[in-house]
């Protein structure tokens, strides 16, 4: 599928990788329905994309709300005059060891269930509802389409990220499940698993910590959103790609 033919939803689009994907698609002439809980970021995205060949439509979206998801997908379909793509990018972190001993008191601390539920609610349940509602619209319209899930190399296991690892692992597994389920509907499903990507947090790291991080990455640098976009673009455009997850991590998980 050519990028200019896309009418695609992007979740978590107010900043970071989601905003970068939206700009790249608008530059290519695609229509984008950008959703996020951060309305200020969405407004900035819309302004940044003004005048580009494509068009970016924005609306507040909380993917952890089933009602929000249904209403957003219905709105996106109407705003763009159709729907043939989804980039499932929204995600949150609530990091912490599942069980740990407090260094000062020696007391045993446990990961709060609320933190677990919050991460799974956005990163897995929310992502699943987005796929369900988007593909249902594609199928009802008889439209061929593509879904790109954002997994993570954390799915290989990462200390202090039980909830995040569980969600991203499940999303990678269901990428294959959904590719099999949706093939008869003309919908492909792929996933990208980013490694360490440049963010305000990594940019604010002290040099010693940053150097230690980079030393573990074979290509010798932290990734940029553009690195991830190149993999996302491949999945969107390659009609013969289906059911697989691409690690884009500079070799960190080798």
Task: Put a short name on every predicted segment.
Residues 2, 221-248, 253:
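C-terminal substrate-recognition "lid" of short-chain dehydrogenase/reductases
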Residues 3-33:
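Canonical Rossmann dinucleotide-binding motif of NAD(H)/NADP(H)-dependent dehydrogenases/reductases
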Residues 6, 81-83, 138-151, 184-187, ...:
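Active-site loop of short-chain dehydrogenase/reductase
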Residues 21, 177-187, 239:
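Active-site-adjacent segment of SDR/Rossmann-fold oxidoreductases
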Residues 97-117, 213:
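Substrate-binding pocket helix/loop in short-chain dehydrogenase/reductase
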Residues 107-115, 139, 146-170, 175-184:
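Catalytic loop of short-chain dehydrogenase/reductase
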Residues 131-132, 176:
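A short, exposed helix-loop element centered on a Lys and neighboring polar residues
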